[in-house]
């Protein structure tokens, strides 16, 4: 019994294999990822990419779906891109946010004297509005990690979360 997952390639996207690295090129940019796993064969056709295995082991059959999902996310990223919308919430002390190089600086959070900072990963674009932050990019994992870094930077410890609700929170994530 073989397990097979098929990912269709959208128009305007080219998919190539270089050894074990899958390269996806599209109108928004290029992505690459190492897709090697023992027992899994990757075949690139003219309109689709096939991930197959002959193994009966659960770990290998699960990995077929995982690699297919990675390929599908890469194809979506280079055609549409990913967008995370975040909301800035504060009650008493107004939070000031600005992008400084590769970090997002959060000033006056809960009236703190020193600013907090969140790392912006390469390959993402962060735009700051009055009470919103948008994170965009073509790599789903990098965009999600950057949004998580921003949310984690405003985490409040040792206080009641029902009272202290200040922070920057992810409100929606979507394809652009």
Curated annotation (Swiss-Prot):
The gene is rpl6. Part of the 50S ribosomal subunit. It comes from the Archaea. HAMAP family: Ribosomal_uL6_A (MF_01365_A). This protein binds to the 23S rRNA, and is important in its secondary structure. It is located near the subunit interface in the base of the L7/L12 stalk, and near the tRNA binding site of the peptidyltransferase center. The keyword Hydrolase does not apply. Disulfide bonds: none annotated. Gene3D superfamilies: Ribosomal protein L6, alpha-beta domain. NCBIfam families: PRK05518.1, uL6_arch. One of its GO terms (biological process) is cytoplasmic translation. One of its GO terms (cellular component) is cytosolic large ribosomal subunit. GO terms for molecular function: rRNA binding; structural constituent of ribosome. This is Large ribosomal subunit protein uL6. Belongs to the universal ribosomal protein uL6 family. The keyword Ribosomal protein applies. It holds the Pfam family Ribosomal_L6. Keywords: Ribonucleoprotein, Ribosomal protein, RNA-binding, rRNA-binding.
